[in-house]
Amino acid sequence: MDLFDAPRGLTVDLFAGGGGASSGLEWATGRSPDIAINHDTAAVSLHKANHPETQHYVSDVFTVDPTEATKGEPVALLWASPDCTHHSKARGAAPNRDKKRRALAWVVTRWAGQVQPSVIMLENVQEFADWGPLVGPVGDRQPCPRRKGRTFRQWVRSLEKLGYEVEWKLLNAAQHGAPTSRTRLFVVARRDGLPITWPTPTHGPGLKPFKTAAECIDWSEPMCSIFSTPAEAKTWGQQHDRNTPRRPLADKTMARIARGIRKFVVENPEPFIVGDQAPVFVPRYGEREGQK
């Protein structure tokens, strides 16, 4: 979908956070969102710094009245990135998944019903499409495997009943030029009669090479050694006027680092080497003090 095909009107960022999605909207449309909502004061402060011209609400998204917030102006685009942690598989079998947080996406249908945005976009983890009822005792609520996706389908139908055409798709950020391989679910709903189109991958086999995180890192920045003791990390923070890095790193983290060095440096025919732009910061080579 080409955002420039959308009619003129307000743009709204629910769950605005520090402003990452809002900056993306600004790059796509040429202007910052008109309205941004988040319950966290610190997040809104950061958002204000990035988007000072936006009208900000420090509030639970359900307590902001869409009609009052928009003051009768038409809404061209509503963006929503609800809390994903209580849907994500990264949470594993963690107890007590929060029913209220899993239900945050229902605020989208509230806005759709009251102010009829021409286009609605939602981004979340891919498990959002499995959104369904929770089962189990209080304190250990887990998604019901037999009713997987039931609530998501109800949510989609509610938008369709309000006159929206709804489509969803998994997109991998790396295939579109971002230096991360994360896959996210994107839902697009529109009621303006224009078609929903999806971006074509630009990076990958046969296309442009994937971008790497290394391209975004300033290797000349001083960094505390991963092998530092807590005392060494504290001294490093004081010397460089930085927060004290957490040391020692967890054993599993060190094991992942070791696997990465083996895969991308030691056993790689084209090893990844930073070069002389990075400062030397490794005082020893063992995983713990006393190892060499």
Where are the language model's segments positioned?
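A generic, residue-level signal for flexible/boundary positions that often mark functional hotspots
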Residues: 31-33, 55-58, 81, 165, ...
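SAM cofactor-binding core of SAM-dependent methyltransferases
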Residues: 12-63
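Active-site glycine-rich loops that stabilize anionic/oxyanionic intermediates
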Residues: 18, 82-83
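Class I S-adenosyl-L-methionine
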Residues: 66-77, 84-291
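Active-site-proximal beta-strand elements of phosphoester/diester hydrolases
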Residues: 12, 77-80
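Conserved alpha-helix/loop element of class I SAM-dependent methyltransferases that forms part
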Residues: 1-5
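Extreme N-terminal starter segment of soluble prokaryotic enzymes
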Residues: 7-10
